[in-house]
């Protein structure tokens, strides 16, 4: 029988198939751990590994093949909880992982932490709601119905609607390429991803204004095409994209670095292209981290102030977001309108936190399965 060359030696398959047996390998009885259902065969058919991802049972060169025993790896929920920044501290609600507060030193430290959080976070947050409804709900609703208020809300939602999907796609592609490939300048490129974290948003707005303004590098090109960047929605979107760029990619890189690649390699062995591997294998493994990064990106996009303030010019009724509306109304001593906008921003923040909690609970629940 003619020998067949197999193209996946990394999977533990032989490079030649000889006449002695279909794979020239001795059959070693062992328990198949790839599927939850009991198997009637005493040999592990590793096509079951791919059955759950490609939706069908397949074989290599028309024959079943023995899969390598996969390396131990964390579950997707554990990776999200342990590797995804703030999720590490929030993902185990009521998990019972801490020690009981059983002495006065621990009680004192807990009390100091609770008092600090209450004074710095909770009291100012609640005071905004108290001030917004101090004169009743009717004045609050009147301010919310103001045309300038509604336009600011519209601009805020539009910025989030544009920047979050773009940074989600970029962050996913960048994270996969940075973790799956080695190339010159990789370390420098990964360092650049953290640049928006270290630069003041006001400086970001100034940089974009100098670059796309009337005397900037692209001034002539922008004049010829009739595109306005400074004091326009385009510039606001660019500024928001810059400050929110690292969130998705930085959430995904630790998960991808700790993910076992055996399933991706097996899928390619069975003929899956890059898109099928991503959609059926990679994406299910990173979905919790991806969703968490999207939530953080959205929260920052809706609350951005400094960069948007510089490049937009804070033009009322044109380039004003809710955060800029709060500043303008407060400076004009229209405190009730400022408090109304602050309450709406706080409500959006609470909604984001609620979604984040649900994501963390779902990830933690899956990790316990």
Swiss-Prot record:
NCBIfam families: 3a0106s02, permease_CysW
Position of the signal peptide: none
Similarity comment: Belongs to the ATP-binding cassette (ABC) (TC 3.A.1) superfamily.
Domain ABC transmembrane type-1 intervals: 153-356
Membrane topology: Multi-pass membrane protein
Record's subunit section: Part of the chloroplast sulfate permease holocomplex. May form a heterodimer with SLUP1.
Source species of the chain: Chlamydomonas reinhardtii
Subcellular location: Plastid, Chloroplast membrane
SUPFAM superfamilies with a match to the protein in the record: MetI-like (SSF161098)
Biological role: Part of the ABC-type chloroplast envelope-localized sulfate transporter.
Record keyword NAD present: no
Top-level taxon of origin: Eukaryota
Principal location listed in the UniProt entry: plastid
GO MF annotation list: ABC-type sulfate transporter activity
Upregulation: Up-regulated by sulfate deprivation.
Protein name, as recorded: Sulfate permease 2, chloroplastic
Record keyword Acyltransferase present: no
Ranges for region Disordered: 1-21
TM helices/strands, residue ranges: 110-130, 156-176, 187-207, 229-249, 335-355
Feature: transit peptide: 1-82
Keywords of the record: Chloroplast, Membrane, Plastid, Sulfate transport, Transit peptide, Transmembrane, Transmembrane helix, Transport
PROSITE patterns: ABC_TM1
Database matches in InterPro entries: CysW_permease, MetI-like, MetI-like_sf, Sulph_transpt2
GO cellular component terms listed in the entry, alphabetical order: chloroplast membrane; plasma membrane
């Amino acid at each position: 029988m003619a020998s067949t060359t197999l193209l996946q030696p990394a999977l533990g398959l032989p490079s030649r198939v000889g006449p002695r047996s279909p794979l020239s390998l001795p059959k070693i009885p062992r328990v198949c751990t790839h599927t939850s259902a009991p198997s009637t065969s005493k040999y592990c058919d590793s096509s079951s590994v791919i059955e759950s991802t490609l939706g069908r049972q397949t074989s290599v060169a028309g024959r079943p093949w023995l899969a390598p025993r996969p390396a131990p790896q964390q579950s997707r929920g554990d990776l999200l909880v342990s590797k995804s920044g703030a999720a590490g501290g929030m993902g185990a609600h009521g998990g019972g992982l801490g020690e009981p507060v059983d002495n006065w030193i621990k009680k004192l430290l807990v009390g100091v932490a609770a008092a600090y959080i209450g004074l710095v976070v909770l009291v100012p947050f609640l005071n905004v709601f108290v001030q917004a409804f101090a004169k009743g709900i009717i004045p609050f609703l009147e301010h919310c119905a103001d045309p300038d208020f509604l336009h600011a809300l519209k601009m805020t939602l539009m910025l989030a609607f544009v920047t979050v999907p773009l940074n989600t796609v970029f962050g996913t592609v960048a994270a996969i390429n940075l973790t799956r490939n080695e190339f010159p300048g990789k370390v420098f490129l990964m360092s650049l991803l953290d640049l928006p974290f270290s630069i003041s948003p006001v400086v970001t707005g100034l940089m974009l204004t100098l670059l796309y303004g009337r005397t900037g590098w692209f001034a002539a090109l922008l004049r010829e095409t009739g595109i306005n960047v400074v004091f326009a929605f385009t510039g606001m979107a660019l500024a928001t994209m810059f400050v929110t760029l690292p969130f998705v990619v930085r959430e995904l890189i630790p998960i991808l670095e700790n993910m076992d690649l055996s399933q991706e390699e097996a899928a390619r062995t069975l003929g899956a292209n890059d898109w099928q591997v991503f959609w059926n294998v990679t994406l299910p493994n990173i979905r919790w981290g991806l969703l968490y990064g999207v939530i953080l990106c959205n929260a920052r996009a809706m609350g951005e102030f400094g960069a948007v303030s510089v490049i937009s010019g804070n033009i009322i009724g044109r380039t004003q977001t809710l955060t800029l509306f709060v500043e303008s109304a407060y400076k004009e001593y229209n405190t009730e309108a400022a408090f109304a906008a602050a309450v709406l921003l706080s409500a959006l923040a609470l909604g984001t936190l609620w979604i984040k909690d649900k994501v963390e609970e779902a990830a933690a629940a899956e990790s316990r399965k």
